[in-house]
């Protein structure tokens, strides 16, 4: 699959930011950083056959990422790490906006909800340009809710992370 035009430009910019985020988080966490878990891209079953699939997958990653940072913020007690996470969250929100705009501009592209909190982009049923509810707030997800999505509904492992993830939050404990 070859990306082109604004999708390629966005993908390259987002890739650069994501690589920088990994380095920033590793530096902020220091010895508390966890090792990279195994990743199974094939489990996603979308994202690599067309530009529209790439946008669908990118939207899922970015929207879940934004909601994950929002949900994790109350759990971060180190002000330096919280400050870094807040700045990354702002960038991730911009990524989400770019991807959602590209989806809105795509002909015939609709996406399905990831869970009951998902706010779909324009072009989808009840879609919105930005991922915000009637109060102008983006959804937040607890670590368990994020893991439920990336594990494909499993409690301990599966989906995108076939062997689970490392760290204190590694299992789905509650979806409330």
Feature annotation, model-predicted:
Residues 1-176:
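All-alpha RGS (Regulator of G-protein Signaling) helical domain and cognate RGS-like helical scaffolds
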